[in-house]
Design a protein with these regions (language model features):
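Catalytic alpha/beta core domains of metabolic enzymes, predominantly
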Residues: 100-230
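Single conserved hydrophobic/aromatic residue that forms the stacking wall/gate
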Residues: 1-7, 11
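Well-ordered, non-membrane alpha-helical segments in soluble/globular domains
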Residues: 22-35, 61-71, 136-140, 203-213
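Short, well-structured secondary-structure segments
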Residues: 9-63
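A structural motif corresponding to the C-terminal end of an alpha-helix
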Residues: 33-46, 73-79, 212-224
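Alpha-helix-loop-beta-strand connector modules within alpha/beta enzyme cores
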Residues: 26-43, 92-98, 145-155
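Short, hydrophobic beta-strand segments that form beta-sheet elements in well-ordered domains
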Residues: 1, 80-84, 127-129
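N-terminal active-site wall of soluble small-molecule enzyme domains
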Residues: 43, 48, 52-78, 83-119
Length: 230
C-alpha cells in the first residue's frame, strides 16, 4: 500500500473447518508450508474462525484445535485468530494463550457505541469495524490513542453499502460450515445479478484508498488496515 509499509499479518480461511465463518474456505497448501512462508517474511498468521453459531460440543474439533496448536507453538512470531463467538474466544484464551484475538467484522456492529464497547474489551488485540463505520470521522477522531491502535479497517469491502441482511448472510455460511443442509444466501443487493466482484470495491462509499490512508487515517492516528480477497 505504502512505500514505507509492510504486511504485518495475513489471515486465512482454512478449508473444511467447522469454526470457520464469513466465507466458505478452500485451499491447497499445507499448514506447515504456509507457516514456513510466514516465518520467512516475519509475518503474523491469523486463522479466520468467525463462525457465529458455535456450541460447546464444537470446541473439541480435532482439525481446528490442531491448527490453533500449530500457530500457538510458533516461537518466532505471535499469531492470531479472528473470532466472532465468545465461546470460542474464551476457549482459545484458555488453551492457546500465545494467540492474540481479533474481533471479526462479521459481528456487523453498525452502531458506533456497540463498536466502541467492542474496542474497549481487553480480550481483543484488534477490532475490525463494519465497513459502514469506516468514514464516521467525527466519532473516530475522538478515540484515544490506545483505542485507535486496536482498530483495523477493511479497505475494500464489496458488499452493498445499504445491505440490511448482512448478519443473515454470515449466519448461513456459519451453518454450512457446521455441515447443516441449508440453501445459499440470496443476496439483496440491487446489482446482485453481477455477482461478488472486487472490481466494485472502489465504487463503495466505504472504500479506503492509499491516498485516504496517507492523508486522512494516518494523520488521525490509525495504522491498521486489511485487504479482502488477497
Amino acid at each position: 500500500l505504502l512505500a514505507s509499509s509492510a504486511a504485518s499479518d495475513v489471515y486465512k480461511r482454512q478449508a473444511d473447518c467447522i469454526w470457520g465463518g464469513g466465507r466458505i474456505g478452500s485451499g491447497e497448501h499445507g499448514v506447515q508450508e504456509v507457516m514456513n512462508l510466514m516465518s520467512e517474511y516475519g509475518i503474523s498468521a491469523r486463522l479466520t474462525f468467525s463462525n457465529s453459531l458455535l456450541r460447546e460440543e464444537h470446541l473439541a474439533d480435532e482439525k481446528c484445535n490442531a491448527l490453533c496448536k500449530a500457530l500457538n507453538d510458533s516461537e518466532e512470531i505471535s499469531n492470531g485468530v479472528i473470532v466472532h463467538s465468545d465461546i470460542l474466544a474464551r476457549y482459545i484464551k484458555k488453551h492457546y494463550p500465545n494467540l492474540y484475538l481479533v474481533s471479526s467484522t462479521t459481528k456487523v456492529l453498525t452502531d458506533f457505541n456497540d463498536f466502541l464497547n467492542e474496542v474497549k474489551r481487553e480480550d481483543f488485540q484488534y477490532v475490525v469495524p463494519d465497513f459502514r463505520l469506516n468514514k464516521v470521522f467525527d466519532k473516530l477522531v475522538k478515540l484515544t490513542d490506545k483505542e485507535k491502535d486496536k482498530v483495523e479497517f477493511l479497505c475494500n469491502e464489496c458488499c452493498w453499502f445499504g445491505c440490511y441482511d448482512r448478519k443473515n448472510c454470515y449466519e448461513i455460511v456459519s451453518r454450512q460450515n457446521l455441515g447443516e443442509d441449508c440453501p445459499d444466501h440470496v443476496c439483496v443487493a440491487p446489482d446482485s445479478q453481477s455477482g461478488y466482484r472486487f472490481s466494485k470495491a472502489m465504487e463503495n462509499p466505504a472504500f479506503i484508498s492509499v491516498d485516504d490512508i496517507r492523508n486522512t487515517y494516518m494523520p488521525m492516528g490509525f495504522s491498521n488496515f486489511k485487504i479482502e480477497g488477497r
